[in-house]
Amino acid sequence: MSKRDEVHEKLICSFCGKTQKEVKKLIAGPAVYICDECIHLCGEIIEEEYERETEGTRELLAPKEIKTLLDDYVIEQERAKKALAVAVYNHYKRLDTSVKTSDVEIQKSNILLIGPTGCGKTLLAQTLARFLNVPFTIADATTLTEAGYVGEDVENIILSLLQNADYDVEKAQRGIVYVDEIDKIAQRSDNPSITRDVSGEGVQQALLKIMEGTLASVPPKGGRKHPQQDFVKVDTTNILFICGGTFTGLDKLIERRVGEKTIGFGSKVTGEKDKNYNQSLQLVEPQDLIRFGLIPEFLGRLPIIVTLDELSEESLVKILTEPKNALIKQFQKLFEIEGVNLRFTDSALATVASLAMKRKSGARGLRSILESCMLDLMYEIPSQEGVKECVIGEEVIKKKEAPMLIFEQAKKQKKQA
């Protein structure tokens, strides 16, 4: 072995112990050496740490900017978008480590969304979580039960959030939880036909603890707790809870309180039915929700009450076409992949909106109507050659008639003419 080879054998990486021959590069420092592999590994570790640090300290958008982002995906509901933008901004500003609040403790303000089915409650919460880049989960209040009953514990909500945060506890503790159908756990003693079982109030009691802020013991695999299993501790103090519900009949309770007559010759007529409903909801007060069946302690954990308007037919037409991820745009993209230009007439869009209004399903019903009407077409189009354009008219929606197909040959003939 030559002297040069002996020197190469003696030079080793101070971190991994590999010799100079075993690596591509070996960089020398004062009495230490580092190889190219260790440099690459260190770079990855530093990058991961940097991403984790910047994720929690990224610049928070101002309320106006948050609302602008919501405008791209949620049609109308201006009042609700403003209220949510301010509430979310204040919540995450409170968690901002750069803002000194040691002299004054800023408490968390959870949010209650009230509005009919398909008005955008869930979409608002989902859109907020996506732009804020925080873990998000949706829980159904109707599946929750208090201890001792068959069903899910409230801690399973936190487990779902933890799973969406890839079991990063610190990240989950800054997340957003949306609890849907919250009105279904209300006690309605004045109307026994729609009263939930006795566990309804128990669920409210269990929820208010995690909503206010507690150190929740979460079973990593879900299910009911038992003493032998290990638990993950999650502090819910900084988790933002958004609860949503339709609260059917709440408008009548509000009208009764403000003294408006809803039937008879002396009834106050203010226009369309949805206008009356929207005007009534805007007058909601905590006492109305307590009469509806929410216990005062639970309502106290939801200081911000936001009402959403019932959508009109014109609003539904806008929802079909205007948002960034509008349904019509989604279908057009699917057809574009097949090389077909998909077009809906104005009357077809109005018919879809009208059907959704009749079904009383709001924006949620638009997709099911379109999917039903487009099924045969989406089945046939990939197998048909030469189709360049497809026009969906009113009769396609109403009577499931075949749409107008324009073939490539016909287009060529038009150009020649």
Swiss-Prot record:
InterPro entries: AAA+_ATPase, ATP-dep_Clp_protease_ClpX, ATPase_AAA_core, Clp_ATPase_C, Clp_protease_ATP-bd_su_ClpX, ClpX_bact, P-loop_NTPase, Znf_CppX_C4. GO terms for molecular function: ATP binding; ATP hydrolysis activity; ATP-dependent protein folding chaperone; protein dimerization activity; unfolded protein binding; zinc ion binding. ATP-dependent specificity component of the Clp protease. It directs the protease to specific substrates. Can perform chaperone functions in the absence of ClpP. Belongs to the ClpX chaperone family. Keywords: ATP-binding, Chaperone, Metal-binding, Nucleotide-binding, Zinc. HAMAP family: ClpX. Residues 1-54 form the ClpX-type ZB domain. This is ATP-dependent Clp protease ATP-binding subunit ClpX. ATP binds at residues 116-123. Zn(2+) binds at residues 13, 16, 35, 38. One of its GO terms (cellular component) is HslUV protease complex. Component of the ClpX-ClpP complex. Forms a hexameric ring that, in the presence of ATP, binds to fourteen ClpP subunits assembled into a disk-like structure with a central cavity, resembling the structure of eukaryotic proteasomes. GO terms for biological process: cell division; proteolysis involved in protein catabolic process.
